[in-house]
Amino acid sequence: MLYLHDVWVNWFEGEENGYNVCHFYEWRKDDAIELLDQVPVLKVSAPLFHHLENSLAEIPKALLEDVYQKAYVRKNHERIQLDYCFIATDGYGIIAIDTIGYHIPIRKSRLIPRQEQLVYEMMKEQEVRTYPFQQSEKEYHILSPHPALMSGLTRKERQLKQLLFMALDQLYGTKNVAEVRYWYTEWAPEKYAYIQQMSFEEAWNGLYEEAKYGWSERHVHLCERLVKGQPFFEKLWEMEQEPKVN
């Protein structure tokens, strides 16, 4: 077992999609950065790496046994043992995992570039560790969008796009045909007459299908209008408007 020492991590909790586990250049000043004193590093198969990075499914039992209590975090000059914490790579991607005592990847982090390079060098000549696990086809939906819909976006844009999808999902739940026609017209005013003839399903699907690709000022405008008057959504919106690096 090989180990990396003094590892900076920025935990993203409960994220099932790897695109929400931000790379170092998207870390923010107000993120809670931790220092791992020691953490085991494993070279795993590409399918298992994808499983760890892009799901909240169970981690293979044999892997958990291999890393049990071999990692330590440094907090307030104390060295605290962690039950199941490790770094995994398939030789291409790298991710740090902490299960906080469970058997699923609750917390995930990328590494800083210098430490990523160390992992690549450490693992270059290592054999892939084989851990049997149950592979399943991942299902994407409006609240867990396909990576293709998030590709090329900044952290702020991804957050706002997911907020827009949450608001559209809530709009779907209203089944209010007048309201959904209104919002579709906000998005595409040139289609006003056409939209007025649409059923609820037609209007909502039309809006979603057009809004789900890319990110633009038009998306920002729709998102801001949709969340207005909804305290939870407004709070998420405001959090992304505060001055930040990205």
Swiss-Prot record:
A Pfam family of this chain:
DUF3603
The entry assigns this protein to a family as follows: Belongs to the UPF0736 family.
HAMAP family registered for this protein in UniProt: UPF0736
Protein name in UniProt = UPF0736 protein Aflv_2136
